[in-house]
Amino acid sequence: MDLKQYITIVPDFPKPGIMFKDITTLMDNGPAYKYATDQIVQYAREKQIEIVVGPEARGFIIGCPVAYALGVGFAPVRKEGKLPREVVRVEYGLEYGTDVLTMHKDAIKPGQRVLITDDLLATGGTMRATIDLVEQLGGVVAGLAFLIELTELGGRKKLEGYDILTLMQF
């Protein structure tokens, strides 16, 4: 299935010059959303995934149905102050400034095989920070899965050494 036909390109969103890739038109098409999810599930099975991790919010949209299909848990990665129990945290650089991501300290067991999911691989900053959280907890990042990769932004360079699945490239 050609998933690109289900992605809507929105010019000048969220700011002028950006060509936003809207995944909601893929998600609201049942067969396309199922196909995309099934592709990631197949990849995850090959990697013997024990838990799925995803950064908020669109990583949840991808990761939760994958975890469900695999019969494994899902561990959310959230911005600081959003998780109620003890967390590990990582600060990472943005274009202008820094941000912080957190994860419950007991979310990953040492040695557990982890799939990290997100909607989009752009610069790789959020994914690199998520990897750092998983590895702080002793998890083994067995794979990274994205719906979309924006190849011109070079995010793969920050993720060298990790196995990456992308369903579409722009």
Curated annotation (Swiss-Prot):
Gene Ontology molecular function, alphabetical: adenine binding; adenine phosphoribosyltransferase activity; AMP binding
**Keyword Hydrolase annotated:** no
Going by the UniProt record, its keywords in alphabetical order are: Cytoplasm, Glycosyltransferase, Purine salvage, Transferase
Q: Where does the UniProt annotation locate this protein?
A: Cytoplasm
Q: List the catalytic activities from the record.
A: AMP + diphosphate = 5-phospho-alpha-D-ribose 1-diphosphate + adenine
GO cellular component terms listed in the entry, alphabetical order: cytoplasm
The family database entries (Pfam families) matched by this protein are listed as: Pribosyltran
Q: In which pathway does it act?
A: Purine metabolism; AMP biosynthesis via salvage pathway; AMP from adenine: step 1/1
The UniProt entry lists the main location of this chain as cytoplasm
CDD domains from the UniProt entry: PRTases_typeI (cd06223)
Q: What class of enzyme is it?
A: transferase
Q: What is its EC number?
A: 2.4.2.7
Does this UniProt record's set of keywords contain Glycosyltransferase? yes
Q: Which domain of life is it from?
A: Bacteria
- Any single biological process term in GO: AMP salvage
What NCBIfam families does the record tag this protein with? Answer: apt, PRK02304.1-2, PRK02304.1-3, PRK02304.1-5
Q: What does this protein do?
A: Catalyzes a salvage reaction resulting in the formation of AMP, that is energically less costly than de novo synthesis.
Q: How does it assemble?
A: Homodimer.
Tell me its family.
Answer: Belongs to the purine/pyrimidine phosphoribosyltransferase family.
Entry's HAMAP family? Aden_phosphoribosyltr
What's the protein name? Adenine phosphoribosyltransferase
